[in-house]
């Protein structure tokens, strides 16, 4: 616990007490909720806290002053043990680490009791958040778990049905008992884990052990290729949002799968050393140091040293998160310094990684690309593992669909899709200056838009200065905005023959009005199982091509429909249309249409993006950047877009199935059908 704050240690000390007692004055109280932990002995700290904060005097086993108010079970306590697992106490624990805590309940709790205890645990979690400590409680029935019925719904914090034995391996290698009975598995060695249940039964029959003295989730002999597949998918899912924490576990599963079916589990190694009296092994009984050693051995055998170096960097960055809070003699700092020397890192490498929270865009992009390459390679290796073992996954199908869709939205590169950089890499990517440069007909650069993070008068345009490229201005601005380079304080410049600075500034303002720069929440599982409906849509008319700027005489008294076939030349005054939209999978996508038929192409594509019978987008914003006829064009396009959307989502129950438009001198008949406009 060295380096953890007072609040963290306070929550860790008091949480078991609050599970043991159920008193109206105490945090976590729920009327009639089961309470009481087997073999519970209150510490001096806990007793003092009760006395000082609530004037309650606690006496072990017989809390006489609480008897009338506490639902206290002396004979059959509902809680057999409380264990914290994961990074707790390891080199990877930081101030932001949560406390994943298993509450092992006795067999036979009624559904109502289970519900009340769940509510009590939730209230204790809420109490802990007052100290900025996140503690997650999981009620675990050992018999239910042993029968592989641990299949709660998949969430960002819960693997659902994706892993069972692997979760138990992690629990056994990292669990620390806070209160209650000890774990039988840690005290009983068998040569083959498949024989564990038989050995336990034999010892019970011969009277050598009393099962009531222990908590037992069973042995580790039921691994399957299917479970490796499901668990690896889930950790890849976690790795998208929390790469530094997940990289090591992803590689551990890959190393385990290579050894399958004769996997050498870390939990088994720990138990062997404990029972052999080896109190000072290389892993120091630190689960994360042991994982690092296992992964290092695996990658070294494959001669994948670049991949190993990336793992080292992720491990260092994750462990380094809180080093500024530690004293110089902290064991975590000393150990990481030893590792950096063993890895042969230069002082410059260490300095660069220490500055990771303050990296700017080029370093962040490089790191983000490395993370994506790593995850993609792990995904390909996982697919190969599935083929090798002919996996027809027994993971709940809904889980697999959710996991696959999450990976799909993160990995797939599509034209117009805005790549969102991982927000954990750096604390602040904002730029003081951004310049957008349009290039056409240059033999050294492909046509499109280039972004430079310097003011225009400092630019010597070169590939080395470019931080991002986009085929359209819309996509490039969206990339800068949603990745937080472009803020309200950013000074903008533009180098273009077609777009003025004032137009760019108005476009950025409208984009900011239409979308928050930060996506506040993860998509719901139900959303990931459905089609990628458009949630918010922003449409820009004539952003990069404005035919009205070349009109010498403004005509009056014309029909709005004439704007698509204007004057004697019958020219469409819509030269370009840009879409920016966020879908229910929380992807940001852009589309660009240009030319005399831009309006037709845009409507056709939009009708295919709005699926029949889905919800109407939460918002549709239309802006026009024309020099002339700005309001007329905006109203005309907005009307067509709203009609198209209304027909597709079913707001118009009996729509006119056709619509006639004259565009650039040609008459077009639009047919609204199930598959969109044709």
Question: Model-predicted segments: where are they?
Answer:
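Short, conserved secondary-structure transition motifs
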Residues: 133-155
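Catalytic micro-motifs at enzyme active sites that drive phosphoryl/nucleotidyl and oxygen chemistry
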Residues: 68-73, 81-93, 124-127
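Nucleotidyltransferase catalytic cores
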Residues: 1-56, 147-155, 172-678
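Extended, Lys/Arg-enriched charged tracts that mediate electrostatic binding to polyanionic substrates
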Residues: 41-78
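E2/UBC-UEV (E2-variant) core
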Residues: 116, 120-134
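Acidic, Ser/Thr-rich peripheral helices and adjacent loops at domain boundaries
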Residues: 155-164
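Short linear interaction motifs
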Residues: 60-67, 76-85, 291-299
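Catalytic metal-binding acidic patch
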Residues: 83, 90-116, 134-138
């Amino acid at each position: 616990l060295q380096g953890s704050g007072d609040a963290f240690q306070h929550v860790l000390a008091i949480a078991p007490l609050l599970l043991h007692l159920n008193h109206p004055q105490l945090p976590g109280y729920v009327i009639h909720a089961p309470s009481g932990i087997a073999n519970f002995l209150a510490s001096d700290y806990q007793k003092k806290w009760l006395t000082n904060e609530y004037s309650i005097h606690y006496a072990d086993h017989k809390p006489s002053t609480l008897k009338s108010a506490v639902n206290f079970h002396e004979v059959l306590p509902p809680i057999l043990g409380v264990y914290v697992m994961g990074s707790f106490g390891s080199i990877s624990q930081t101030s932001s680490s949560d406390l994943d805590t298993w509450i092992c309940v006795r067999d036979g709790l009624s559904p109502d009791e289970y519900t009340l205890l769940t509510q009590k645990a939730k209230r204790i979690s809420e109490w802990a958040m007052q100290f900025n400590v996140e503690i997650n409680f999981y009620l675990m029935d050992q018999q239910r778990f042993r029968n592989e019925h641990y299949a709660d719904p998949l969430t960002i914090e819960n693997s659902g049905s994706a892993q069972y034995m692997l979760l138990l391996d992690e629990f056994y290698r990292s669990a620390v008992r806070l209160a209650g009975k000890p774990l039988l598995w840690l005290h009983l060695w068998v040569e083959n884990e498949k024989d564990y249940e038989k050995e336990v039964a034999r010892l019970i029959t011969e009277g050598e052990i009393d099962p009531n003295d222990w908590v037992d989730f069973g042995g580790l002999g039921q691994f399957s290729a299917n479970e490796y597949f499901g668990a690896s998918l889930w950790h890849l899912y976690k790795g998208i949002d929390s790469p530094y924490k997940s990289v090591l576990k992803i590689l551990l599963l890959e190393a385990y799968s290579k050894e399958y079916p004769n996997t050498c589990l870390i939990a088994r190694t720990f138990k062997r050393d404990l029972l052999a009296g080896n109190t000072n092994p290389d892993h120091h009984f630190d689960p994360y140091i042991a994982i690092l050693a296992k992964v290092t051995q695996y990658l070294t055998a494959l001669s994948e040293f670049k991949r190993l170096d990336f793992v080292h960097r992720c491990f260092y960055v994750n462990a380094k998160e809180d080093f500024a809070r530690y004293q110089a003699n902290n064991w975590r700092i000393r150990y990481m310094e030893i590792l950096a020397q063993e890895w042969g890192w230069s002082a410059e490498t260490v300095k660069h990684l220490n500055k990771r929270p303050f990296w700017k865009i080029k370093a962040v992009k490089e790191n983000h690309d490395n993370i994506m390459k790593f995850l993609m390679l792990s995904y390909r290796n996982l697919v190969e593992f599935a083929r090798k073992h002919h996996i027809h996954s027994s993971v709940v199908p809904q889980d697999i669909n959710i996991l696959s869709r999450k990976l799909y939205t993160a990995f797939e590169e599509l034209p117009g899709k805005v790549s969102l950089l991982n927000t954990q890499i750096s604390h602040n990517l904002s730029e003081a200056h951004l310049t957008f440069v349009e290039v056409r007909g240059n033999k050294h650069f492909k046509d499109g838009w280039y972004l430079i993070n310097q003011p225009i008068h400092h630019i010597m345009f070169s590939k080395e200065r470019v931080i991002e490229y986009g085929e359209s201005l819309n996509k490039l601005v969206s990339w800068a905005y949603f990745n937080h380079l472009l803020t309200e304080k950013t000074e903008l410049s533009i180098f273009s023959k077609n777009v003025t600075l004032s137009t760019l500034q108005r476009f950025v303002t409208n984009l900011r009005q239409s979308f928050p720069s930060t996506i506040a929440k993860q998509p719901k599982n139900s959303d990931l199982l459905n089609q990628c409906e458009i949630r918010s849509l922003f449409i820009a008319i004539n952003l990069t091509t404005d035919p009205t700027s070349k009109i010498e005489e403004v005509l009056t008294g014309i029909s709005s429909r004439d704007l698509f076939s204007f004057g004697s030349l019958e020219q469409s005054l819509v030269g370009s249309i840009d879409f920016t939209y966020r879908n229910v999978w929380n992807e940001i996508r852009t589309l660009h249409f240009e030319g005399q038929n831009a309006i037709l192409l845009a409507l056709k594509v939009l009708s295919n993006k709005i699926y029949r019978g889905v919800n109407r987008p939460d918002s549709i914003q239309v802006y026009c950047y024309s020099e002339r006829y700005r309001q007329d064009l905006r109203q005309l396009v907005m009307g067509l877009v709203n009609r198209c959307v209304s027909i597709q989502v079913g707001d118009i129950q009996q729509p006119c199935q056709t619509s006639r438009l004259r565009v650039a001198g040609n008459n077009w008949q639009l047919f609204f059908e199930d598959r969109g406009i044709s």
